[in-house]
């Protein structure tokens, strides 16, 4: 079926976490959705599972593309152009913003204005997303995590021994690591 042979209710640009979630929710409501992605689907091969190949070796990062930092200096973007977008390199971590993240924030460069919505208004949508993505966790492990109306549906995965060692060292130094 050609794209122009059909009427779409919505066109979503980008098949990463946000775009794919939006397309999924709209299609569940019976809407015709066209999802446009600049990258292709990653072939199912071992080098597309390895974080080293995907992130450190920049296998799917844009070649020859530079973005500009606040000082105007160019830097290579840490992004992936593929179906799924940066979910290919994000480590499957889905954190909620903190309550204070929604407030006005003074920075060296100026003031970042407050969001037009609050954490409390976003909380039901966090619940929906966490349920849809089957997020694992336990409230209270991260001492900075905001309040939640429901506990995680899925318990956290056990911490791997090497990460437990790192966690212990960081805690001895007064840090608050969590997994």
Where are these regions (language model features)?
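N-terminal glycine-rich phosphate/pyrophosphate-binding loop and immediately adjacent elements
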Residues: 2-120, 124-127
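Conserved redox-cofactor binding core of oxidoreductases
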Residues: 106-179
């Amino acid at each position: 079926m050609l794209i122009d042979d059909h009427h779409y209710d919505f066109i979503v640009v980008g098949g990463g976490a946000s775009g794919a979630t939006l397309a999924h929710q709209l299609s569940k409501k019976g809407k015709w959705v066209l999802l446009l992605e600049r990258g292709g689907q990653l072939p199912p091969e071992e080098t597309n599972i390895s974080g080293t190949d995907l992130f450190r070796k920049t296998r799917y990062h844009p070649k020859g593309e530079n973005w500009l930092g606040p000082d105007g200096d160019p830097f290579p973007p840490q992004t992936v152009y593929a179906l799924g977008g940066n979910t290919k390199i994000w480590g499957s971590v889905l954190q909620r913003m903190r309550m204070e993240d929604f407030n006005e924030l003074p920075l060296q460069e100026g003031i970042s204005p407050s969001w037009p919505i609050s954490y409390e208004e976003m909380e039901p949508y966090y619940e929906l997303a966490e349920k849809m993505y089957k997020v694992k966790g336990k409230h209270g492990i991260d001492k900075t995590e905001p309040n939640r109306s429901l506990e995680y549906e899925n318990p956290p995965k056990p911490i791997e021994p090497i990460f437990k060692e790192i966690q212990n060292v960081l805690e001895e130094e007064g840090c608050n690591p969590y997994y």
